[in-house]
């Protein structure tokens, strides 16, 4: 398979919290040994209560995000209510199962049943978990997640854990780096953290 327009080195993290979910990623997009892009967007708002992360083919990933977002909007129009996280993940799984793509995604958020995160592979395989990491630096990220995750963790606390996990990946994985993206979804909706907010947390971690 050609690696043209492909993220080969992504590291992403998703954490389920008692009051929402947290997503984090680094920003490097690599093609083989080339750092092709230093400010790649890897976290997407799907709806007010749903977000997703991507790794894989740029074209496939962007198309998938647009289709999922359209499906969630269509569901609201047809049913007069927001789609559940399980249903949104199932729709995404069906899309990938019927048309496999070179992409891996995390999808999660908050609905009437609480917070949840699902991992989807290129063929549509779907797994729900409390915390998940994908990509070339996931081994290093999982070390932090396994050590620092605990039941009933809050979004605020998980944000620092997620940044620590991505930081560990960028320090050891040559295909991950060039900054951080962090977002959360709570009952109040989707929020992407500003660079200054992320930098303040990193400074706290380093102190």
From Swiss-Prot:
Signal peptide feature range: none
Domain of life: Archaea
The enzyme's E.C. designation: 3.4.25.1
Propeptide: 1-9
Protein's cellular compartments: Cytoplasm
PROSITE patterns given in the database record: PROTEASOME_BETA_1, PROTEASOME_BETA_2
Enzyme active site: 10 (nucleophile)
GO CC annotations on file: cytoplasm; proteasome core complex, beta-subunit complex
Regulation: The formation of the proteasomal ATPase PAN-20S proteasome complex, via the docking of the C-termini of PAN into the intersubunit pockets in the alpha-rings, triggers opening of the gate for substrate entry. Interconversion between the open-gate and close-gate conformations leads to a dynamic regulation of the 20S proteasome proteolysis activity.
Main subcellular location of this protein, as a coarse class: cytoplasm
Biological processes per GO annotation: proteasomal protein catabolic process
Record keyword Ribosomal protein present: no
Keyword Cytoplasm annotated: yes
Keywords: Autocatalytic cleavage, Cytoplasm, Hydrolase, Protease, Proteasome, Threonine protease, Zymogen
Pfam families in the cross-refs: Proteasome
Subunit structure as annotated in this protein's UniProt entry: The 20S proteasome core is composed of 14 alpha and 14 beta subunits that assemble into four stacked heptameric rings, resulting in a barrel-shaped structure. The two inner rings, each composed of seven catalytic beta subunits, are sandwiched by two outer rings, each composed of seven alpha subunits. The catalytic chamber with the active sites is on the inside of the barrel. Has a gated structure, the ends of the cylinder being occluded by the N-termini of the alpha-subunits. Is capped at one or both ends by the proteasome regulatory ATPase, PAN.
Functional summary from the UniProt entry: Component of the proteasome core, a large protease complex with broad specificity involved in protein degradation.
Family membership noted in the UniProt record: Belongs to the peptidase T1B family.
Protein name: Proteasome subunit beta
Biological source species: Methanobrevibacter ruminantium (strain ATCC 35063 / DSM 1093 / JCM 13430 / OCM 146 / M1)
